[in-house]
C-alpha cells in the first residue's frame, strides 16, 4: 500500500528526517532514492537505510515544531507493513500530538478497509504446492536411518547415540524441507495465497505452512520425549493411521495450551499488579548517586538486546566522556535520547544509568530514576502509576508466550550447532597444527575438537569457482582464486583431516554458538534387554563406586561391549542336589533332568546316612537327609518363581553337621552332611538366577577373593562338580544371598530368608546399619537410623525379653533378639526365642552372682565365674526368656523350635520358656528362680534355644538359625573330634555373622563363650548355649566358635552377622590391637568388594576369601575385604515379608532381586571400633536409650561416636510373640536384609514394635577405643561368659566399667538390679579361656560390658517412655553387638601360634557354632587364649564391648546362620572342620585345617564360609544347600525359589551352510552383523551371535545381541547373569547443553518472579553474598549481592520475552524486581531490637544499624517471590487481604494493630476514595511532609464523615500545606 497524505508543515517534514534519523529499518526491501518527493533526501535515505526494528526518536527538537501544518504532500513509495505503521504513528505523535494522530489513524483504518474490500484471497487445495525435492530428501533420510540401524546391530553405537542420530536426521530433513517450501513459493508464485498468508504478519507462521505442504516432522509424546518416528506426510497428502494417532496428542496439546495459557497469563498479570500497584512517581529527584550498569545482553554469541535499545529513555547517573575526544558526551541526570544512545553505544560497552532498582524514594520512584514514559517520549509525570503500567506491560505479552517445558533427549543440531558445509569439492589443508583432542560426538562419530581458533583452506579441485561460497555464511569464508578459506572459532568439531578430499556440501565442521555460557545437564537413559538370555561381558572396564549407604554401583570407565546370549531357563520342580544333566548335554522334552527323593521325617530327628555315627539329631521334622543333595549341578540355574529367581543352595543345610560329628568326619559323605535341617538355603539371585553351583561357590568359597587356589583344591575334592573351583568365582559375582528354609518352618521362613526381616533389611552391619533401620519399612517401628550395626541394633528382643535381659542372669539376655541388631533395627523378634537362649549363656555367670545382682560384681566376678559350669543353667533361664512368651505357648517347638528344628531341645525349651515368658517380667523372673528352674528343666532344651539364638544371630548375617539347629544336632552326635569339627564350621559361620554385628566386641566375646564351654557342657552353654547342653563335650566346641568370633569378627561384623565375616576378623588377628582399627576399616572394604558378587551367596564366598587373604594379610587388614558377606544382605528390605511370611516366595524373590549386596555393611560395622562403640552402647542403653543421642552413653560412649548407637534403634519391632526367630542377615547394604525365621509358629503380630530409640545403641562405629575392646561386645553375649576373663577389666575398664557400673545405670539406676543384665558377668567367668592365651584371659572379661546395656532399669524405661517394654528391649540391643566383635579382636593377638590357631578353630567364630563342634576342650581353650591375647592388645576396646553381652547371645544364633550360609560346605566342612581348622591368625578362624584337607576353606577367616567349601566332597558344600528341598516342593520356600537350568533351544541358534569353505571364525568367537564367516567372504552373518559349533559344512551360532555401553554407564547385571527380555541392562549417562528451551515461556517467567525455593536463584544469591562477604563488609556485601541478583533476574526475564519475539522495556521489569529484592533476613539481632529470622527491608536495617552503638544487626539478603511480596502486610493489609488469604491477613493485621496508610491504588479503590495517582496525587500525597500521615487520616475522616465530602478548599489547603 502506498500512502499519499499531506503534512501541514514543511518544518515538520524536515523534523521527521532530521530529528528522526535512524527512523526505520527496511531490511528486505530495495530502497529507491527517488521515492521521497520533497524534503531532505539525504536524511530520508539515511533513515530508511539504517533501519532498526523499532523507531529511535530524537527528542532534541520535537515538540517545538507543532506549529502550523503545511499542506505539502509527501509520497512514500513503500509497502507499509506493521513496523512502518508503528514508526509513522510514533513520528506523528511526537510531532503533532495525540489529537492529530488519532485523526491520521482513523484515515488509515478507512483506507485499509476500503482496499481489503476491493481485493480478495481465495485458498484452494491446489494452492498447496508440495516441493519436488521432498521425495529425495525423505529417501536420503531413510537411507541414513538404515545405516544407523546397521551400526546399532553391530554394536557400534550406544542406544542414546542411535536415538540422537535418528532424531537429528529427521529434524534436519524437516528443516531443509521447510526451506525448500519457502524457496519454491518464492521462485514460482509470490502471490500464492498460502505464501502471502505465511508472511503477512497475521497469526500463524511458516511452521503451519510446513505442515501443510512439507512434512509434519517429529512429534513429542505426553512426557515431552521426542518420538523417533517422524510424520513424513503433510496435510495435503494426508496422514497414515499411525501418523494420525501420533500427531493427535500434539494437536490437542496446542488447543489446551492456548486455553491454559490465557488463564496462566492472566493470573501472572494479577500477581504483578498486586505487587507493584503502589509504585507511583512521587518526586522529581531522590538525590541518589547510585545506578545500575547497562550493557548489551547476549545469548551465546548473538545479541539479544543491544545497549543502544536499553539506553533510550534512561537518565544518566554520571558524566559520560568520550574517551577518544575526551569530551563530555552526557552529563549526570541528563535524559538519553535515541541519538545520544547511538553515540554512547558506539564508544562504551556499559553505561551507569539511574534505575528504579536504586531509587531512594521512600515509597514509589522518582522521575529521574524512572526516566521517560515510553508512550510519551518524555520524562514521566509526577503521580503516574508506573507500577501498574509495568505489571500490565509484563503480563500482557504473556498470552504470546508458550507454556511448554520440554526435556528432549539432547538438543537438535539445528538449535545449537552451526554446521559448516564444503562450498565446493576440494582438498582440505590446515595451515598450522591445531590444539585439540579426539572426541566421540553425540552421534557416535569420532571427530576432532579444537581448543583454539583456526582456519582451513579448501583447495579447489574443479574449475567452476563462481558462486561457490554462497552456501557458506559469508562471515566464515573468503574465496580466493582456486581456494576457499574457512575460519572457525574455538571449540569447533572438525570432521575432516588434513589432506582429505571433500565433496560439495559435505559437513566439514560444526561449532556451537552457545559456547561456555550454558551449563550442561547430566541425563540418563535406561537400556533394557532386547532378548532373554545370558549376559556376557566381552570387553568391559568397570569401576566400583560406593555411596554413603555403601550401595555399590558398577560403572564403565571406558566404552564397554556386553552381549546378551540367547537362552531360556528350565525351572525344576524340586530343588535337588543332583542334576542328571551336565552342561553340554542334549535334552528333549522327555529327558529326565533330575530326581529327588523326598523324605518326611516324622520325628524332628534326621539321621545322616553317611556318617558312621549316625547322629540322631533331634531335628524338627522338617529336617531331611540331604546327602544326595550335595550333588547339585552348579551349572544348573534356579529361578525364583517369585519376583526374582534365586538359586537354592544346599548350603543352607549344613546338616553335614552330622558328618562332622563323626570323628572321621572326613569319611562321611558330603551328602550326609547335607542332612541339613529342613530349611534349604536358597540364594536369591539378583535378577537372574545364577547357576546353582555358582551360588555355592559364593558360599563355599570365600576363597574367591584370593584364596582361589585353596578353594579350588577343596572343591575338587569334595565337590561333586569337579570344576567347582572355577565356578566359584563367577558365582561370587552373582549371588546376592542365600536362603535356607527349614522344612518345619518352610511355610514360615527360610534360613536366609531375608524377606521377612524386611525391617532390618536395611540394616547394614556396619555403620550403615542405622540407615537400614530406617528403611525397615515393614515394622512400623521407629525407623531410627539405627546406626548400630546390625548387631546391637536388633533390639528386636521381645519387649518382655528385654526385661529379662535386665535380669541379672544372662539368661535374661533373652534379649537375643538384640543380636539381630546386626541387621539393623529390622531384625525381627523372630529371633527372639533364640535370642533368649543366647542370653542364657551369660546367665550362668549371672546366676552365680544373681543374688548380688550388681553389674560391677558381675564384671569382676566374671573372672572368677569364668570357669563355672553354671552357664548351662543359665541357658535354661534364657530359654524362657528367649522365646517370646507367645511364641512359646504357640508351640514353641513348632515355631521357635521349628526354627531350630534341628535341635530337638528346642521343644523342651519351649515349654520352659513359656513359663518364663511373661514378657514384661520376663527379665525378673528369669533372673530369679525361674531362670534356675528352667535350667533344671532341660538342658537339651537349652540347646534348642541355642539354636534359636543362633538364628537371631543369623539375623544379622543370614538366616542361619535353622542351620544352627543342625549344627546342634551334629554336636549331639558323639564323635567329638569330628563332630566337633563339623560343629565348628557351623559355629564359625555363625560367628562370622555375629562378628559382623559385634565388630567392636569382636575379640573378647567369641572367645569367652567358648572358654566357658570348654570345660564342660556348662561351658558349652555359653558358647552355644543350646549346644552345650546337648553335648557336654560339645561345650568345647562352643568355645571354638567363641573364638572365632573374637577373630576377625570385628570386621566381619560389619557385614552381617551371618557372614563368614568372622574369618576376616581373623585376619585382623594378626594385627591385633592396631589391627583393630584398621580392621574396621578394611573389613568394610572387603565386604564391599565381595558384595558385588554375591549378593546372596556371597556370604560364604566372601568368607572364604577372607580366610585365605586373611592369612596372608594377617596384618593387612586389607584382606578382610574378601568377605563379601554383605552380599548376603542382598535381601535388602523385603518388608513385605512378615516374619510369618518369611517363606512367601514372593518375598524371597524380592530379596533376590535386590541383589545389592548387603554385605558391604559388614564392613561398615567393622569400621567403628566396634569394641568401643559397643561398650559405649551399653552405657548408652542405660541412659535412656536416647539412641539418637549416642552421646548418651557418655562415659563409655564418649569414646566413639555414639553415633553408631543410633543405629541401634532399630530393633524395632520385636515381636515378642513372634518368636519366629527370624534370623536376619544384616548387611551393610541398606535395604538389604536377610532373615531367617526360625519359628514357624510365630504370628505376625508377635512383633512388638520396640522403640529402637530405647536401645541406645550407642555403639558407635567410630569408637576407636581400643578396638580390641570392641570385640567383646558382640560375641560376648553368649560367649560372654567365657569371655569374661578376657575382658580383663582393663579393657573394659575404661569406659566399660564406668559405663557399666554406674553409667548405665545411672539412668537406670535401680533398674540395674534386674536389668543389669550385667549378668554378663557370668560371661566373665568365661575368662577361663585363659588356658590358651596366657595373656588374654583377663581380656576376656571385657565382654561382660555388654550388659551394661541399659536394659535393666525400669527407671530407664520410665524415663524414656519407650514402649512399654522398653527396658528389656534395650538390653537386647546391646547384646547383639557384643558377640562378634569380641571374638575378633582376640584372634588377632593369637594368630601366631598354631596351637592357638587350632583352638581358635574350635572356638570358631560364632559361639553358636559351638554346638556343632564337639571339638576338644583344648581347642576351645586355645581359642579363648587367643581372644585374651587380642584383648590384651586392646584392653580398652574390650571394655567397650561391655555392652555387647546381650548381643553375644544373639551372636550365637547368627553363627548358625552363617553356617547355613555356607551350608553347603557346612556339613562337610564341619566334619573336616576339626582338621580343617588350620588356624588362622584370628582366633576365630579355624585355620588349623590340619585335619582335613578341606581345611583350606577354613582358611578363610570366616571359618564358616570355608566350611561350606570344606565339605570333603566338594559337592556337598554347594549342593547340599540345594537339597534342602526337603521342605518339599510344597513348602512355601520351594515355591519361592526353584532351581533352574539354562537351556539353549533351537530358537536360540542359527546355522549357516558353508559348504566346506574355510571358516574365518573359531568356536567361542563373537560375530557381529555383517561379519564374514568364510575366507571367500561370501557368507556374512545376518544375526550377530557366538560361534558354538563348526563342522565341515555348517557353522552354528548362538544368537546374541551386542550392546555398547558408553563410559560412565551403570551396570545392572553381572557377567553370567540371566536376564529377561525388557529387564534393565545398563543405564547410560550423557550430558547435553542446558539451553533456553528446557523451560520456556510462562513457566520460566513465573519461576523467576516467584523465586521458587527449588530454583537456582536462591542458591545464586547465597553464593554471590558469600563471595562479596570475603571482599567487603557484611552490610555492603548484602547490598551488592542484592544488586547483582536484581540484574540477573532482569536479564533473564528480558531474555525469555526476547526469545519469543516480545520486547519489554527494562524499567518495567526493574520495578517488579525491586519489590522482590527489598528484604533481608536477620541473622543476629545485635542491639537492634529485631528478631532472628525476621524479614525486614534493607533500608530499615541499615538505618537502624546507623543509630546503634555496639553490636549491629547482621543480616543476609533474601529473595521474595511476587506472591509473597504481594501478601506483605507491612505495606498494606487491605491490599494484601484483597489478593489472597483474606482471613489470615486481616486477623494478623488486627492482632498486630497495623495501620494502613493507604499509599497504594488498590487500598483506595477498595475504600472508594480518590486514588493517589494522576489528579489525586497532588491532593493527597506529599511524601516529604513529615505530617503527611496525619493529614491522610484527617482527609479520610473528612471524606467518610463530613457531609460535604472533600471540598475544593480542602484540596487546595492540603496541597498548600503539604508543599
Swiss-Prot record:
Cofactor(s) of this protein: Zn(2+)
Positions of Zn(2+) binding: 286, 359, 366, 369
GO cellular component assignments: chloroplast; DNA-directed RNA polymerase complex; mitochondrion
Cofactor binding remark: Binds 1 Zn(2+) ion per subunit.
Record flagged with keyword Cell wall biogenesis/degradation: no
Main location: plastid
Gene Ontology MF, one: zinc ion binding
Biological process per Gene Ontology, one example term: DNA-templated transcription
CDD domains with a match to the protein in the record: RNAP_beta'_C
Catalytic activity: RNA(n) + a ribonucleoside 5'-triphosphate = RNA(n+1) + diphosphate
Transferase in keyword set: yes
InterPro entries linked: DNA-dir_RpoC2_beta_pp (IPR012756), DNA-dir_RpoC_beta_prime (IPR045867), RNA_pol_Rpb1_3_sf (IPR042102), RNA_pol_Rpb1_4 (IPR007083), RNA_pol_Rpb1_5 (IPR007081), Rpb1_funnel_sf (IPR038120)
Localization per record: Plastid, Chloroplast
Superkingdom field: Eukaryota
Top enzyme category: transferase
Pfam annotation, one family: RNA_pol_Rpb1_5
EC number: 2.7.7.6
Keyword terms: Chloroplast, DNA-directed RNA polymerase, Metal-binding, Nucleotidyltransferase, Plastid, Transcription, Transferase, Zinc
Subunit structure: In plastids the minimal PEP RNA polymerase catalytic core is composed of four subunits: alpha, beta, beta', and beta''. When a (nuclear-encoded) sigma factor is associated with the core the holoenzyme is formed, which can initiate transcription.
HAMAP family in the cross-refs: RNApol_bact_RpoC2
Record-stated family: Belongs to the RNA polymerase beta' chain family. RpoC2 subfamily.
Role of this protein: DNA-dependent RNA polymerase catalyzes the transcription of DNA into RNA using the four ribonucleoside triphosphates as substrates.
Name the record gives this protein: DNA-directed RNA polymerase subunit beta''
Species, as recorded: Oltmannsiellopsis viridis
Lineage: Eukaryota, Viridiplantae, Chlorophyta, Ulvophyceae, Oltmannsiellopsidales
Amino acid at each position: 500500500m502506498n500512502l499519499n497524505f499531506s503534512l501541514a508543515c514543511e518544518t515538520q517534514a524536515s523534523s521527521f528526517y532530521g530529528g528522526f534519523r535512524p527512523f526505520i529499518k527496511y531490511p528486505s526491501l530495495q530502497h529507491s532514492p527517488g521515492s521521497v518527493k520533497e524534503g531532505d533526501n539525504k536524511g530520508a535515505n539515511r533513515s530508511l537505510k539504517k533501519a532498526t526494528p523499532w523507531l529511535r526518536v530524537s527528542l532534541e527538537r520535537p515538540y517545538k515544531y507543532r506549529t502550523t501544518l503545511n499542506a505539502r504532500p509527501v509520497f512514500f513509495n513503500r509497502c507499509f507493513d506493521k513496523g512502518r505503521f508503528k514508526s509513522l504513528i510514533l513520528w506523528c505523535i511526537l510531532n503533532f500530538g495525540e489529537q492529530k494522530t488519532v485523526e491520521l489513524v482513523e484515515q488509515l483504518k478507512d483506507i485499509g478497509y476500503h482496499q481489503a474490500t476491493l481485493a480478495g484471497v481465495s485458498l484452494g487445495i491446489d494452492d498447496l504446492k508440495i516441493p519436488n525435492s521432498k521425495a529425495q530428501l525423505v529417501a536420503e533420510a531413510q537411507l541414513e536411518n538404515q545405516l544407523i540401524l546397521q551400526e546399532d546391530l553391530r554394536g557400534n553405537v550406544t542406544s542414546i547415540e542411535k536415538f540422537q542420530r535418528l532424531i537429528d536426521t529427521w529434524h534436519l530433513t524437516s528443516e531443509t524441507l521447510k526451506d525448500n517450501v519457502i524457496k519454491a513459493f518464492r521462485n514460482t508464485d509470490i502471490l500464492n495465497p498460502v505464501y502471502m498468508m505465511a508472511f503477512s504478519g497475521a497469526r500463524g507462521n511458516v511452521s503451519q505452512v510446513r505442515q501443510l505442504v512439507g512434512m509434519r516432522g517429529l512429534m513429542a509424546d505426553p512426557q515431552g520425549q521426542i518420538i523417533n518416528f517422524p510424520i513424513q506426510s503433510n496435510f495435503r497428502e494426508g496422514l497414515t493411521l499411525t501418523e494420525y494417532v501420533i500427531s493427535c496428542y500434539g494437536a490437542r496439546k496446542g488447543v489446551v495450551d492456548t486455553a491454559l495459557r490465557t488463564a496462566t497469563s492472566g493470573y501472572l498479570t494479577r500477581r504483578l499488579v498486586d505487587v507493584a500497584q503502589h509504585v507511583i512517581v512521587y518526586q522529581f529527584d531522590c538525590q541518589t548517586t547510585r545506578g545500575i550498569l547497562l550493557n548489551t545482553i547476549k545469548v551465546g554469541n548473538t545479541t539479544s538486546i543491544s545497549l543502544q535499545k536499553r539506553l533510550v529513555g534512561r537518565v544518566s547517573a554520571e558524566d559520560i566522556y568520550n574517551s577518544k575526544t575526551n569530551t563530555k558526551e552526557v552529563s549526570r541526570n541528563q535524559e538519553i535520547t535515541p541519538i545520544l544512545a547511538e553515540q554512547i553505544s558506539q564508544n562504551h560497552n556499559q553505561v551507569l544509568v539511574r534505575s528504579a532498582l536504586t531509587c531512594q524514594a521512600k515509597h514509589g520512584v522518582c522521575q529521574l530514576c524512572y526516566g521517560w514514559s515510553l508512550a510519551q517520549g518524555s520524562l514521566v509525570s509526577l503521580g503516574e502509576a508506573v507500577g501498574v503500567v509495568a505489571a500490565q506491560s509484563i503480563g500482557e505479552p504473556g498470552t504470546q508466550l508458550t507454556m511448554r517445558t520440554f526435556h528432549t533427549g539432547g538438543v537438535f543440531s539445528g538449535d545449537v550447532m552451526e554446521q559448516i558445509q564444503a562450498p565446493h569439492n576440494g582438498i582440505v589443508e590446515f595451515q598450522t597444527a591445531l590444539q585439540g583432542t579426539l572426541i566421540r560426538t553425540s552421534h557416535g562419530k569420532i571427530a576432532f575438537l579444537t581448543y583454539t581458533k583456526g582456519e582451513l583452506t579448501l583447495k579447489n579441485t574443479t574449475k567452476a569457482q563462481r558462486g561457490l561460497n554462497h552456501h557458506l555464511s559469508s562471515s566464515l569464508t573468503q574465496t580466493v582464486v582456486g581456494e576457499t578459506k574457512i575460519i572457525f572459532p574455538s571449540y569447533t568439531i572438525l570432521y575432516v583431516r588434513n589432506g582429505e578430499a571433500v565433496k560439495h556440501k559435505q559437513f566439514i565442521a560444526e561449532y556451537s554458538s552457545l559456547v561456555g555460557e550454558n551449563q550442561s545437564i547430566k541425563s540418563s537413559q535406561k537400556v533394557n534387554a532386547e532378548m532373554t538370555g545370558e549376559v556376557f561381558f566381552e570387553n568391559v572396564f568397570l569401576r566400583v563406586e560406593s555411596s554413603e549407604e555403601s550401595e555399590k554401583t558398577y560403572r564403565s570407565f571406558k566404552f564397554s561391549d556386553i552381549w546378551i546370549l540367547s537362552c531360556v531357563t528350565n525351572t525344576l520342580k524340586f530343588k535337588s542336589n543332583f542334576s542328571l544333566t551336565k552342561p553340554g548335554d542334549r535334552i528333549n522334552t522327555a529327558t529326565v533332568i533330575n530326581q529327588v527323593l523326598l523324605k518326611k521325617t516324622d520325628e524332628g530327628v534326621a539321621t545322616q546316612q553317611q556318617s558312621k555315627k549316625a547322629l540322631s539329631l533331634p531335628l524338627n521334622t522338617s529336617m531331611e537327609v540331604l546327602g544326595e543333595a550335595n550333588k547339585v549341578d552348579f551349572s544348573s540355574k534356579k529361578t525364583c518363581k517369585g519376583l526374582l529367581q534365586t538359586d537354592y543352595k544346599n548350603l543352607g543345610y549344613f546338616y553335614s553337621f552330622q558328618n562332622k560329628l563323626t570323628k572321621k568326619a572326613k569319611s562321611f559323605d558330603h551328602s550326609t552332611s547335607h542332612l541339613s535341617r529342613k530349611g534349604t538355603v536358597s540364594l536369591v539371585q539378583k535378577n537372574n538366577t545364577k547357576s546353582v553351583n555358582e551360588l555355592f561357590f559364593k558360599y563355599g568359597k570365600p576363597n574367591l577373593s584370593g584364596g582361589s587356589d585353596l578353594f579350588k583344591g577343596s572343591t575338587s575334592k569334595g565337590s561333586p562338580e569337579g570344576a567347582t573351583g572355577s565356578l566359584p568365582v563367577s558365582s561370587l559375582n552373582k549371588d546376592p544371598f542365600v536362603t535356607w528354609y527349614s522344612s518345619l518352618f518352610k511355610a514360615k521362613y527360610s534360613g536366609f530368608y531375608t524377606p521377612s526381616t524386611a525391617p532390618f533389611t536395611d540394616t547394614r552391619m556396619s555403620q550403615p546399619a542405622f540407615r537400614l533401620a530406617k528403611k525397615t519399612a515393614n515394622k512400623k517401628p521407629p525407623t531410627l537410623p539405627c546406626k548400630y550395626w546390625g548387631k546391637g541394633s536388633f533390639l528386636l528382643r521381645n519387649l518382655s525379653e528385654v526385661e529379662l535381659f535386665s535380669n541379672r542372669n544372662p539368661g535374661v539376655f533373652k534379649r537375643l533378639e538384640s543380636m539381630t541388631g546386626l541387621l539393623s533395627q529390622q531384625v525381627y523378634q523372630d529371633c527372639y526365642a533364640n535370642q533368649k537362649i543366647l542370653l542364657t549363656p551369660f546367665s550362668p555367670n549371672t546366676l552365680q552372682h544373681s543374688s548380688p545382682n550388681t553389674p560391677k560384681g558381675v564384671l569382676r566376678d566374671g573372672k572368677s565365674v569364668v570357669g563355672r559350669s553354671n552357664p548351662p543353667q543359665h541357658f535354661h533361664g534364657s530359654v524362657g526368656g528367649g522365646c517370646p512368651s507367645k511364641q512359646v505357648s504357640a508351640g514353641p517347638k513348632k515355631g521357635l523350635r521349628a526354627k531350630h528344628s534341628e535341635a530337638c531341645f528346642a521343644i523342651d525349651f519351649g515349654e520352659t520358656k513359656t513359663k518364663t515368658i511373661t514378657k514384661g517380667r520376663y527379665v525378673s523372673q528369669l533372673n530369679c528362680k525361674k531362670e534356675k528352674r528352667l535350667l533344671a528343666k532341660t538342658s537339651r532344651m537349652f540347646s534348642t534355644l541355642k539354636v534359636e539364638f543362633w538364628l537371631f544371630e543369623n539375623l544379622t548375617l543370614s538366616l542361619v538359625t535353622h542351620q544352627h539347629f543342625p549344627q546342634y544336632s551334629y554336636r549331639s552326635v558323639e564323635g567329638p573330634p569330628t563332630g566337633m569339627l563339623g560343629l565348628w564350621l557351623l559355629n564359625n559361620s555363625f560367628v562370622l555373622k555375629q562378628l559382623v554385628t559385634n565388630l567392636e566386641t569382636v575379640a573378647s566375646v567369641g572367645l569367652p563363650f567358648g572358654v566357658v564351654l570348654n570345660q564342660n557342657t556348662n561351658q558349652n552353654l555359653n558358647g552355644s548355649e543350646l549346644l552345650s547342653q546337648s553335648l557336654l563335650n560339645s561345650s568345647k566346641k562352643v568355645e571354638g566358635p567363641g573364638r572365632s568370633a573374637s577373630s576377625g569378627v570385628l570386621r566381619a561384623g560389619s557385614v552381617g552377622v551371618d557372614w563368614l565375616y568372622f574369618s576376616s576378623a581373623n585376619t585382623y588377628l594378626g594385627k591385633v590391637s592396631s589391627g583393630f582399627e584398621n580392621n574396621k576399616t578394611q573389613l568394610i572394604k572387603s565386604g564391599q568388594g565381595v558384595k558385588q558378587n554375591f549378593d546372596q551367596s556371597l556370604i560364604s564366598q566372601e568368607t572364604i576369601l577372607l580366610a585365605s587373604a586373611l592369612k596372608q594379610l594377617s596384618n593387612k587388614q586389607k584382606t578382610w575385604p574378601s568377605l563379601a558377606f554383605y552380599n548376603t544382605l542382598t535381601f535388602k528390605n523385603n518388608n513385605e515379608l512378615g516374619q510369618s511370611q518369611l517363606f512367601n516366595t514372593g518375598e524371597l524373590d524380592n530379596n533376590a532381586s535386590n541383589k545389592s549386596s548387603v554385605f558391604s555393611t559388614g564392613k561398615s560395622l567393622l569400621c567403628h571400633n566396634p569394641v568401643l562403640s559397643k561398650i559405649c552402647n551399653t552405657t548408652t542403653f542405660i541412659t535412656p536409650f536416647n539412641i539418637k543421642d549416642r552421646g548418651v552413653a557418655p562415659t563409655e560412649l564418649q569414646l566413639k561416636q555414639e553415633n553408631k548407637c543410633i543405629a541401634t534403634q532399630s530393633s524395632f519391632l520385636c515381636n515378642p510373640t513372634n518368636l519366629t526367630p527370624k534370623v536376619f542377615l544384616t548387611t551393610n547394604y541398606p535395604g538389604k536384609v536377610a532373615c531367617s525365621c526360625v519359628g514357624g509358629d510365630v504370628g505376625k503380630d508377635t512383633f512388638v514394635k520396640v522403640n529402637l530409640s530405647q536401645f541406645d545403641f550407642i555403639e558407635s562405629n567410630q569408637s576407636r577405643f581400643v578396638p580390641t575392646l570392641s570385640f567383646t561386645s558382640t560375641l560376648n553375649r553368649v560367649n560372654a561368659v567365657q569371655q569374661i576373663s578376657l575382658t580383663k577389666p582393663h579393657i573394659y575398664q575404661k569406659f566399660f566399667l564406668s559405663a557399666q557400673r554406674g553409667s548405665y545405670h545411672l539412668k537406670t539406676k535401680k533398674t540395674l538390679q534386674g536389668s543389669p543384665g550385667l549378668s554378663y558377668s557370668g560371661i566373665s567367668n568365661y575368662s577361663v579361656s585363659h588356658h590358651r592365651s596366657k595373656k588374654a584371659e583377663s581380656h576376656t572379661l571385657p565382654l561382660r560390658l555388654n550388659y551394661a546395656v541399659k536394659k535393666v532399669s525400669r527407671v530407664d524405661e520410665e524415663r524414656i517412655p519407650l514402649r512399654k517394654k522398653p527396658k528389656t528391649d534395650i538390653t537386647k540391643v546391646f547384646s547383639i553387638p557384643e558377640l562378634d566383635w569380641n571374638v575378633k579382636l582376640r584372634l588377632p593377638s593369637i594368630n601366631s601360634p598354631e596351637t592357638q590357631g587350632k583352638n581358635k578353630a574350635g572356638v570358631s567364630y560364632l559361639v553358636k557354632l559351638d554346638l556343632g563342634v564337639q571339638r576338644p576342650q583344648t581347642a576351645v581353650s586355645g581359642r579363648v587364649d587367643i581372644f585374651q591375647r587380642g584383648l590384651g592388645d586392646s584392653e580398652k576396646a574390650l571394655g567397650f564391648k561391655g555392652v555387647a553381652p546381650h548381643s553375644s547371645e544373639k551372636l550365637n544364633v547368627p553363627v548358625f546362620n552363617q553356617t547355613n550360609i555356607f551350608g553347603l560346605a557346612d556339613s562337610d566342612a564341619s566334619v573336616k572342620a576339626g582338621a580343617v581348622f588350620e588356624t588362622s591368625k584370628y582366633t576365630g578362624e579355624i585355620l588349623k585345617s590340619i585335619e582335613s584337607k578341606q581345611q583350606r576353606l577354613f582358611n578363610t577367616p570366616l571359618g564358616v564360609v570355608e566350611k561350606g567349601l570344606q565339605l570333603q566332597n566338594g559337592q556337598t558344600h554347594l549342593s547340599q544347600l540345594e537339597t534342602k528341598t526337603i521342605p518339599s516342593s510344597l513348602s512355601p520356600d520351594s515355591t519361592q525359589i526353584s532351581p533352574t537350568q539354562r537351556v539353549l533351544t533351537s530358537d536360540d541358534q542359527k546355522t549357516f551352510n558353508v559348504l566346506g569353505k574355510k571358516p574365518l571364525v573359531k568356536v567361542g568367537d563373537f560375530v557381529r552383523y555383517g561379519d564374514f564367516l568364510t575366507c571367500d567372504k561370501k557368507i556374512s552373518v545376518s544375526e550377530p551371535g557366538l560361534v558354538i559349533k563348526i563342522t565341515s559344512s555348517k557353522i552354528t551360532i548362538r544368537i546374541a545381541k551386542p550392546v555398547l555401553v558408553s563410559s560412565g554407564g551403570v551396570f545392572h547385571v553381572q557377567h553370567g547373569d540371566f536376564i529377561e527380555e525388557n529387564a534393565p541392562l545398563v543405564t547410560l549417562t550423557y550430558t547435553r547443553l542446558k539451553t533456553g528451551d528446557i523451560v520456556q515461556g510462562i513457566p520460566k517467567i513465573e519461576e523467576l518472579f516467584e523465586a521458587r525455593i527449588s530454583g537456582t536463584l536462591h542458591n545464586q544469591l547465597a553464593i554471590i553474598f558469600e563471595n562479596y562477604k570475603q571482599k567487603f563488609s557484611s552490610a555492603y556485601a548484602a547490598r551488592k549481592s542484592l544488586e547483582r541478583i536484581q540484574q540477573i533476574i532482569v536479564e533473564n526475564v528480558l531474555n525469555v520475552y526476547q526469545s519469543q519475539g516480545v520486547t519489554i522495556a527494562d524499567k518495567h521489569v526493574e520495578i517488579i524486581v525491586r519489590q522482590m529484592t527489598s528484604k533481608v533476613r536477620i541473622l543476629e539481632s545485635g542491639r537492634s531490637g529485631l528478631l532472628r529470622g525476621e524479614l525486614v527491608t534493607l533500608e530499615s536495617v541499615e538505618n537502624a544499624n546507623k543509630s546503634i552503638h555496639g553490636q549491629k544487626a547482621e543480616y543476609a539478603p533474601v529473595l521474595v517471590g511476587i506472591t509473597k511480596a504481594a501478601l506483605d502486610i507491612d505495606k498494606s493489609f487491605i491490599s494484601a487481604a484483597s489478593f489472597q488469604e483474606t482471613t489470615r491477613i486481616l486477623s494478623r493485621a488486627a492482632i498486630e494493630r497495623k495501620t494502613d496508610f493507604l499509599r497504594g491504588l488498590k487500598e483506595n479503590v477498595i475504600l472508594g476514595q480518590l486514588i493517589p495517582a494522576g489528579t489525586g496525587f497532588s491532593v493527597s500525597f506529599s511524601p516529604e511532609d513529615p505530617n503527611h500521615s496525619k493529614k491522610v487520616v484527617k482527609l479520610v475522616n473528612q471524606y467518610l464523615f463530613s457531609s460535604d465530602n472533600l471540598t475544593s478548599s480542602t484540596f487546595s489547603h492540603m496541597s498548600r500545606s503539604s508543599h
